[in-house]
Amino acid sequence: MNTFGHRFRFTTFGESHGKALGCIVDGVPAGIKIDEKFIQSEMDRRKPGQNKFATQRKEGDVVEILSGVFEGMTTGTSISMIIFNENQKSGDYSNIKDLFRPGHADFTYFNKYGIRDYRGGGRSSARETAARVAAGAIAKLLLKELNIDIRSGICEINGIQASNFDFENVKDSEIYALDKSVEEEQKNAILEARNSHNSVGGVALVNVKNCPIGLGEPLYFKLDSQIANAMMSINAVKAVEIGDGILASKVKGYENNDQIRKAGFKTNHTGGILGGISNGDEINVKVYFKATPSIFIEQETIDIYNNEVNCNLKGRHDPCVAVRGSVVAESMMALVLADMVLLNLSSKIENIKKVYEK
């Protein structure tokens, strides 16, 4: 499946070493002002080759809008966007075209489909997430009309945890670090892994401010279930925590409950979601990325003929996918919320009457 969402939905296409990749976004209301500079700025946050903490594959990631926008405004029809690949080096993968790279989707894709694009993983490559960020930028422009603000940052690298979450620090940080006091240590962990031909994992925090009460469709389209679904669809994500997450299973009910006052909730252990519906508090989600599987250390594997062989990788890869992955997680949050905003319009007859009553 290449489509995500119900009312506000997007479909992505393209491969890592193909001619282009892109997306089609459906369900976008007419009349939203499209800021192409903003869309490109979102792409620039995710694009590769910007510093020594990311892959050295250099892509401009310039987005071209093909449809759905007229004179700077959405028309209510499908918005299609395309991003042309510019810096593929398919020759880097010729030595592993018959091998299954440990930690990658090569083995499962080949066994499922009987064929695979070995050039950078093809469709299974994280290169696909560029299209998600483009679609997420459209979702953000919709949410901006409602003053819903989404931000993200890195709260952990290789077990080095942030104790302070400062989203202002993220803006000037090469690794989008939330805590300046541990940023250098986190950077060093990435560089040490890179210099030893290895990789490290990390954790991104996604935060939503000004989310209205009522987003989420129980029972089988709950807000938290769709957030988890969205985040787990991102390459290399192995776990998602909403609010206190795992900690909620380790404390007693009185400690975990968010008591309610006239001014709002006393605490926010639940992460802004109750019963699958947003409660008006800030939404907090932690997204856990595994260490990049593409490493330059010899590993054991098998080939497509079931022979046991050794695997030696070449190419250009992120020493820590969590850094750029945090931007993708932020985009997926925007796409989920845009969908939920539109779905919520039909929750009450009063909402429908406002549109159709004369």
From Swiss-Prot:
Pathway: Metabolic intermediate biosynthesis; chorismate biosynthesis; chorismate from D-erythrose 4-phosphate and phosphoenolpyruvate: step 7/7. The keyword Flavoprotein applies. Transmembrane segments: none annotated. It is an enzyme of class 4 (lyase). GO terms for molecular function: chorismate synthase activity; FMN binding. Keywords: Amino-acid biosynthesis, Aromatic amino acid biosynthesis, FAD, Flavoprotein, FMN, Lyase, NADP. Pfam families: Chorismate_synt. Signal peptide: none annotated. It catalyses: 5-O-(1-carboxyvinyl)-3-phosphoshikimate = chorismate + phosphate. The keyword Flavoprotein applies. NADP(+) binds at residue 46. One of its GO terms (cellular component) is cytosol. FMN binds at residues 123-125, 235-236, 275, 290-294, 316. Its cofactor is FMNH2. Reduced FMN (FMNH(2)). Its EC number is 4.2.3.5. Homotetramer. Belongs to the chorismate synthase family. This is Chorismate synthase.
